[in-house]
Design a protein with these regions (language model features):
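Helical "lid/coupling" subdomains associated with nucleotide-phosphate turnover
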Residues: 2-28, 40-45, 50, 56-90, ...
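Post-signal peptide N-terminal segment of secreted/secretory-pathway proteins
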Residues: 32-33
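Two-metal-ion RNase H-like nuclease active-site motif
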Residues: 92-96
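Active-site-adjacent helix-turn-beta-strand microarchitecture at beta-sheet edges
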Residues: 99-102
Length: 390
């Protein structure tokens, strides 16, 4: 994260691991797979070279995905624990997914996603920042504390406000290690806020060597548990939640849930499309869109889409994108009424909408951009790589 590129040594190591993994897949006669790249590869300057090297040297086709897609997968994996999930999100609930490059906080109320926000608070990113600044080991928790406080203050003022959060659902790689090996009640997945805070406080007071021995993990990974514990504790303090549920979900579970749904192996009872629309409506509310007008535009757009379905042949996914465009078509007026469509384009492109790929966000942004002006067929330049959507 500090250098902005992946070294050839790491590329060699990745290729070696992937080659060995491919051999394991052959042993089990695996017929299909999914390989995704998250923030480390997505943000690297040499990402395309690395992806090409992996494909040539291992035969593995890696698909880079944006943060909103990645978090949506994890969210689906949590929702796959159907009964517990539905019961938990009936009251004010937050899902906190702490990753290596960033963290995601999603707020629920009465079974509906209210808002979701990505924060640049990843355990590896924070650890590398502390190392780059040559921070004294004993000062690392204090420095990370300050970085986390700064990000959470903005989130609290903009998104949390007076919302009451009763439950916290904690997901991510680090929380699994922290709980499975660090808490005496390892056979449980629910804890009171006080129990969880006490555990996090104990972990942050340990040295990396002590964590390495106690958790029986490698030294490099042991160093990542400290920022993880700080993030979870700080978020819990900010939310004021009473209980913590740790379902043991990580990104791999999310990938499996996504694949199972696409292959029609499982069917979710939760309305994920409703969550995406709810997120868009809350975004429109934040930018002071006129609700009555927006609702009428959305209703008319959907009616026209449905009435002309036999002519355009588009799917329900395209209808969802049209709905989002209708909901957000006036958000640019928050910045300037005279150039509202151009401003709306910039706002949508700068905002992650959970569950949408970068290409889908570009489609929505361009539909809004050319809402009241002539469509420039030769003027639209998309950033997305179409090869992964073919």
């Amino acid at each position: 994260y500090n250098d902005g590129k992946i070294t050839y040594v790491l590329v060699d190591e990745m290729c070696q691991v992937l080659r060995e993994f491919m051999e394991v897949m052959k042993t089990y006669r695996v017929q299909d797979y999914r390989a995704y790249a998250s923030s480390a590869l997505r943000e690297a300057r040499n990402s395309q070279i690395v992806l090409d090297q992996i494909l040539v040297r291992t035969g593995v086709r890696v698909i880079p995905i944006n943060n909103s897609e990645l978090r949506f997968m994890t969210y689906k994996a949590v929702a796959s624990k159907d009964a517990e999930f539905q019961k938990t999100v009936q009251t004010g609930t937050a899902i906190v997914d702490v990753g290596f490059g960033s963290s995601q906080i999603s707020l629920f109320d009465k079974d509906t996603l209210v808002s979701t926000q990505n924060l640049i608070l990843g355990v590896l990113r924070l650890s590398e920042m502390a190392a780059h600044w040559k921070v004294n080991y004993h000062m690392i928790p204090e420095v990370i504390d300050e970085l986390v406080d700064n990000e959470l203050y903005t989130f609290k003022k903009m998104y949390l406000k007076d919302r009451q959060i009763k439950n916290l659902i904690a997901t991510g790689e680090s929380i699994i290690y922290m709980v499975k090996k660090g808490m005496k009640e390892a056979n449980r997945d629910r804890f009171t806020a006080e129990q969880f805070k006490a555990f996090c406080k104990k972990l942050t007071s340990m040295s990396v060597d002590e964590i390495e021995d106690y958790y029986e993990i490698e030294h490099d990974y042991a160093a990542l548990l400290i920022p993880g514990a700080i993030i979870y504790k700080k978020v819990l303090d900010m939310l004021g939640a009473e209980s913590v549920w740790i379902p043991g979900i990580r990104l791999c579970d999310g990938i499996a849930a996504e694949y199972a749904e696409e292959s029609r192996l499982i069917k979710f009872h939760h309305d994920f499309e409703g969550d995406i629309l709810s997120s868009a409506r809350n975004m429109a509310k934040r930018y002071k869109c006129y609700a009555a007008h927006t609702q009428e535009v959305e209703r008319t757009a959907v009616a026209l889409f449905n009435a002309t379905r036999k002519y355009h042949g588009l799917s329900n996914r395209e209808r969802l994108l049209l709905q989002i465009a209708a909901i957000l078509h006036a958000c640019g007026k928050f910045v300037s009424i005279t150039k509202s469509t151009e401003n709306a384009y910039q706002i949508i492109m700068a905002t992650e909408i959970i569950g949408l790929s970068h290409l889908e966000r570009e489609i929505v942004a361009n539909v809004v951009r050319y809402n009241i002006q002539e469509f420039a067929y030769d003027g639209v330049i998309l950033e997305s790589d179409f090869s992964r959507h073919g």
